[in-house]
Amino acid sequence: MKRNPHFVSLTKNYLFADLQKRVAQFRLENPQHTVINLSIGDTTQPLNASVAEAFASSIARLSSPTTCRGYGPDFGLPALRQKLSEDFYRGFVDAKEIFISDGAKVDLFRLLSFFGPNQTVAIQDPSYPAYLDIARLTGAKEIIALPCLQENAFFPEFPEDTHIDILCLCSPNNPTGTVLNKDQLRAIVHYAIEHEILILFDAAYSTFISDPSLPKSIFEIPDARFCAIEINSFSKPLGFAGIRLGWTVIPQELTYADGHFVIQDWERFLSTTFNGASIPAQEAGVAGLSILPQLEAIHYYRENSDLLRKALLATGFEVFGGEHAPYLWVKPTQANISDRDLFDFFLREYHIAITPGIGFGRSGSGFVRFSSLGKREDILAACERLQMAPALQS
């Protein structure tokens, strides 16, 4: 059997797996130090009681011969699709356009597989590493990095003379923590329509947006229905990281160049490749949507971001993002240190594990990412260490 040639283009280790190995090695060699890990975007707050109760009740029903059930609908429970349409999208996305999945990352893989190999895929730089790896694994003909630089407020720079088939766009952004406003998002949508580009819009952090003027969905721009697909997740807002539940929106108006409707092929694709997300997870998701606007976990993580920002600014770092996302994009000021050494510096001097920006792409060079998804006691301890230890010096 021949090896899949696309694996040749991957790095040996996935970024976050490699970081955890380095943290484990440091702990082994320095048992006297307690490492605070702010490198991974993993949730730390427990499930809301009503969500946990819905989950447990659903599992209990599966244990009874009178209420147990087998496969659920391929496209998701009607109750969950309808509640997302009414409560999350306020009716501007129809329930039939919402497809429930087992997570945003796997949906990204499904979508790029669905559209087939030999596509030219554009990705923000810096960006979540899975975009690049999945584009490679699914046989992208060309992958174009769109620089998102500090001097341009991390807004992507689009090429003038290169055709793009698919644009992966994330807002609120991972890793920069910044969010596109309506004018910026509208400009990207119109650019996509003009250049016949499909946007895969990752809105996994949209529930962190607190400013009502900022778009939580690309479909707040009406024309996006002709050029975009949206991916979202229950992982961060509801603490479903280990439960796995997400969704994808395919607008009914979206067509291929030949006029055929994408949603028809997507339904056929899912019927063949997917038997539906976990029923207990979906029923817990219905309960979670009822409390989402008042969810304490989101406020908790926002407060973590505020604490980290104040400590980092007081220590002499430049800080971006974090207001509408659980990530802070941090730049050491007056420093002359290589990207390779940034991770080791924070681990050695502060005993804090962060993510070096270069791991998210070339344009991440010189930055590091802090996650605010940790426990409050760890965030407070990290803030204390940042203020006591020496800042980077040139």
Swiss-Prot record:
GO molecular function: L,L-diaminopimelate aminotransferase activity; pyridoxal phosphate binding
Its biological purpose: Involved in the synthesis of meso-diaminopimelate (m-DAP or DL-DAP), required for both lysine and peptidoglycan biosynthesis. Catalyzes the direct conversion of tetrahydrodipicolinate to LL-diaminopimelate. Is also able to use meso-diaminopimelate, cystathionine, lysine or ornithine as substrates.
Name under which the protein is recorded: LL-diaminopimelate aminotransferase
Enzyme Commission code: 2.6.1.83
Reaction(s) catalysed by this chain's protein: (2S,6S)-2,6-diaminopimelate + 2-oxoglutarate = (S)-2,3,4,5-tetrahydrodipicolinate + L-glutamate + H2O + H(+)
Binding-site positions, substrate: 14, 41, 105, 128, 174, 275, 369
Alphabetical UniProt keywords: Aminotransferase, Pyridoxal phosphate, Transferase
SUPFAM superfamilies in the record: PLP-dependent transferases
Required cofactor names: pyridoxal 5'-phosphate
Domain of life of the native organism: Bacteria
One Pfam entry name: Aminotran_1_2
Top-level class of the enzyme under EC nomenclature: transferase
Listed pathway(s): Amino-acid biosynthesis; L-lysine biosynthesis via DAP pathway; LL-2,6-diaminopimelate from (S)-tetrahydrodipicolinate (aminotransferase route): step 1/1
Subunit-level organization: Homodimer.
Residues the entry annotates as binding pyridoxal 5'-phosphate: 71, 104-105, 128, 174, 205, 233-235, 244, 275
Name of the gene: dapL
Entry similarity comment: Belongs to the class-I pyridoxal-phosphate-dependent aminotransferase family. LL-diaminopimelate aminotransferase subfamily.
UniProt modified residues of type N6-(pyridoxal phosphate)lysine: 236
Lineage of producing organism: Bacteria, Pseudomonadati, Chlamydiota, Chlamydiia, Chlamydiales
GO biological-process terms attached to the record: lysine biosynthetic process via diaminopimelate, diaminopimelate-aminotransferase pathway
